[in-house]
Amino acid sequence: MEKQEQQKVSRLVFVLIPFQGHINPMLQLATILYAKGFSITIIHPQFNSPNSSNHPEFTFIPISDNLPKSQVSAGDLFGIVSALNKNCEGPLTECIQEMLKAEDPHDRISCIVYDSTMYFSQSVADHLKLPGICVRTSPAATMLAFAVFPCLHEQGYISFLGKV
């Protein structure tokens, strides 16, 4: 029986958030899917970029995040996440549109796989009529915390700004 070279016939675009504990799970998933025959493109903000030399089989594309150094150095995690979601939507849309223009029919974009913290990615996927898959890179125990928040709010233990 002849061993045939596996041809990559479909591309997955991964959108990473540049935080510890989020990059590795996404790259691990990308590695598994690469082994199953998918081509992988990693799109990431310029801030805290992953080391592309650790995964030479992937295509890494940085996009502008327009994060001011003062915001990053202040360590305001929620502010950084909010700014990334606001600032990266346009650059991600432009990047994927360019990929679609140059698309090889044997290497078409099948899906955008994104970290749940980069929630703007679904809007980009919808706009470009591509499927989007949201991946929660947080431990399963955090799901329990999210489930309990409304109850804690109702009992007056915590409060939220705006609607819950």
Predicted regions, residues:
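Glycosyltransferase specificity loop/lid
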Residues: 1-164
